[in-house]
Amino acid sequence: MKHSATAQPHATPIRRGGIPVPLLALAGGLLASYLPMIMPSLAGISFLGWMLPLAIAVIHLLMYVGRMKFPLMLWAPWIAWVAGYTLLADAHNALQRGIMLLTPLIVAAAFSTLRPTADLLNRIDRWIKIFLWVFLAAAGIATGLLSSGVLYDTTNFAAGSITASLLACWFATRYVLMRQWRDLLLWLIMAAVPVLANTRTGMVAVALTLPLVLAPWSVLRRALLLAALPVVGLALFQTERIQKKMFYSGRGTVDDAMTAVYNMFTGEDHVEADFATSGRSVLNMALRRGLDDAYFFGHGANTTEAISLRITRVAHPHNDWLRLRYEYGLIGTLLFAATMLIQTWHGWRAARRVPSPINIHLYVGVSAFLPMAIFMLSDNVILYVAWFGNLQFALLGLGYAIAHQVRMAEMRMDAS
């Protein structure tokens, strides 16, 4: 995808070799997250996945805050809510968790200060394709496909499925805007990643990225694809590998699975012992029992960690919505959900005013809120900022910078 300049190609601030440093930091963070899967000896650098983009974004933003185009004020109530809870928190690691929740917003603000040139946009498009190969190599090793030639029944690539959903949003949007079959093929490859990784929520989240993409696309095509997905899903459900993942006995029906999932997420009834929940149902019930004790305002930042460690020996409950509800209360959860919806609407409106294909960054950013909301039901996507949030909000921030540049160019044309 070759971009043409939409305004004068001003030099981008804080640069090294013509590349904005926030972009280098984001790329470094992605590599720090995925290279250890390919080369385990690099496991010690994984913490840079979220810290490097954050540190550079803060420095960059302090220097160029006057150029910020990202609508940070939309998120101001949520930022204040998290900051207040973090300052008052008694739980261990509350400060780190609070910072991680807000990191994507800082990254978005920093990227929105950049002056997008055609060279920069083409470079980002090219780098995403390069990262795709790193990602696929990590996926191949983590799932056993490249390391042993046989797919593992269980994998440690749940976070990879989260990244796959964001890449799927990129290629889905690119396909819808550009009509290139290569992008559709790459989307199909992304849709296959959670199948290979055997991550149940990931299969649903990634599959929905194309039919529910927020870029303009035929309603008929969306409907046909949505109609085909249950057929594909049913076929996958019957495979031995997924049956083993779903049921301890290795065999169950769709009705068994749907009933168990509904009961696990709503807490209305017990979950059948044969349904494999990876400990989620027990932890979810423990957290739900405490919701009424702090119904509106929650128990405080990161108070779920101690409960999760006691029950599952894992630091985070694999349900971000329940986590928010327990820690930040009903008001905090509704505040986050409402802000996410407002940001989606605001970004979608901005994307409609930008010519294609340079509106791809905004469309991808807002389309990614759907898989994010789905993953929040069974994972920690709001904390896995290195795997999802940083890149999503970087694209949003850059999209707003492009929208501002287009608007300024139109104003100059009207004035002349």
What do the PLM-derived regions correspond to, one by one?
Residues M1-G84, T113-N122, R126, R174-W181, ...:
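Transmembrane signal-anchor hairpin modules in multi-pass inner-membrane enzymes, especially those
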Residues I38-F47, A91-R97, Y152-G160, D183-R222, ...:
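Helix-loop-helix junctions and helix-breaking kinks within/between transmembrane helices
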Residues H270-Y328, W348-R352:
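Long extracytoplasmic/lumenal interhelical loops at the membrane interface
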Residues E327-A373, A409:
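Hydrophobic transmembrane alpha-helices and their immediate junctions
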Residues V364-F375, N380-S416:
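Transmembrane alpha-helices of multi-pass inner-membrane enzymes
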